[in-house]
Amino acid sequence: MFAILHEACDNTHDRKKVYAMKFELMHPADQLVMIMNRIYQYGMTTTSGGNLSIRDESGDIWITPSGIDKGSLTRADINCVKPDGTILGPHKPSVELPFHRDIYRIRPDLRAIVHAHPPTLVAFSLARKIPDTHLVPDATLVCGNVAMAKYDVPGSEQLGKNIAEKFAEGHNTVILENHGVVCGSTNLFKAFMAFETLDFCGRLEIDAKKLGTPRSLTDAQIELESAKAHPPMDAFVARVISSEECAGRRDMCHLIHRAYDQRLFTSTQGTFSMRLSDGSFLITPYMKDRKYLEPEDIVRIKNGMCETGKTPSRAALLVQEIFNTHPEINSVIIAHPPAIMAFAVTDATFDSRTIPESYIQLRDVKRVPYASSSLDIEGTANAFCSSTPVLIVDNKCVIVAGASLLNAFDKLEVLEYSAKAVIAAQDIGKIINITPEEVKDIEEAFHLT
């Protein structure tokens, strides 16, 4: 049986190639290695911390080992625990196996569990508080109603009972007092999505509280966004793919991966788009993992029609309206980076007059009301102009427009870096912005109109 496990995909390039075959078709051991590598790479667990598991259709539990370096895990390290308790594999399974078993026993609908100790969520567990998942519309839909489980010794029977009790109540995401977080779902990627999204909410809330009082969405506002339908579009079959389109798909994927690695995106949040010379445009697909997006996943929109067999981002109509309204705009990026989103969920005003680069790239950043990007597409598109290439949508996202794909991405980076600097400055002293006279000098020197 374990001969299969030794046909290992032991480096990131190989894992990426396997992922392209569809995550759900990967062997459980490969899935566990890929997601654990991802969690460790982004500083969300330590060498010895955290454990993941998958329960397959036969009832076997595939689980990460105890005491093995999480930064260099291979599929050969993964244990398989049979329903009768037999353990297959070269290592001792995670000491947290008891609570994984308890959760699977009490919740037969769950097939995967993620447990780790990201610093942000550990901070909430120390304060015995739950991150506010109502700051942005999608978080509650992904994480569900988050619970808090009482503390006990790691690996103990009592800790397993404490956690299982919360899952028995119907929660899929549980913070453990003075410990970390546990997320369960019907597959490993969905469990990871909940884990990643809750961590994002925690980072957002911490940043927002440095600027003011975070503003939560009501259930009605969240429902308004969750009811948003995909834009109705006829399909077309692409007979010819130009070199320009091929290059655009390649470049989009390259920058999307960078955006994810820089934590400007999460696995399923974030939209890139790029206008082509024939008037059509490319856009990211709906609900596909941004970290491993491939050129063939990108969706082309032409004359209001969608490339057949694909589902575009729900922002496709907004992007189309922006391109139609502004011929000078050739790329639109929609993202939710936590630092700039801290401004979106508070009444704090973002002022780009911090350093010259910020003002040159961002100029006059404006904000628009929540849901306006869905309910008032024309008004949102008209809000852009040469001096306003960035919009902050309350409690939802930022929309960045550029003359090119790289130009828009550069603006997004500068926006988030500037927001981080402003938030960090709150602990240092009063911010002194560039003066109006100095702004005028910048405008003259860089020919800004």
Q: Where do the PLM segments sit?
A:
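Glycine-rich flexible loops
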Residues: 19-449
